[in-house]
A protein has these predicted regions:
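Glycine-centered tight-turn and secondary-structure capping sites
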Residues: 65-69
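RNA-contacting regions in translation and RNA-metabolism proteins
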Residues: 1-60, 74-96
Length: 96
């Protein structure tokens, strides 16, 4: 390996994979809603996996869920796929 090349880990020791997944979920949700300041995520690491609860303004909950649940289904699919990559199950819920 050349002296000018460095190998770095993309996650710090303090940051859990579930935190990185939650950051991505928050980024997606903030892009969907009108009131970004009302968006908050509660991440709970459980024995069986991770639960990410999305709280947003009541008027924006429909935008996060989407017509026939398409938006939240897509968000769940992305979060679960990332969770599988790190060996964890991830569930996403909207509290509205």
């Amino acid at each position: 390996m050349a002296a000018d090349q460095q190998v770095t880990d993309s996650t710090t020791e303090e940051e859990l994979p579930s935190d990185r997944i939650a950051d991505l979920v928050e980024l997606i949700v903030c892009g969907l809603v009108d009131d970004e300041d009302s968006v908050s995520l509660d991440v709970t690491d459980r024995e069986g996996g991770t639960l990410i609860e999305i709280e947003c303004a009541e008027a924006d909950a429909g935008k996060v869920i989407g017509r026939h649940g398409r938006q939240i289904k897509a968000i769940r699919t992305i979060a679960r796929a990332l969770g599988q990559r790190v060996g964890s199950s991830v569930d996403v819920e909207v509290l509205g």
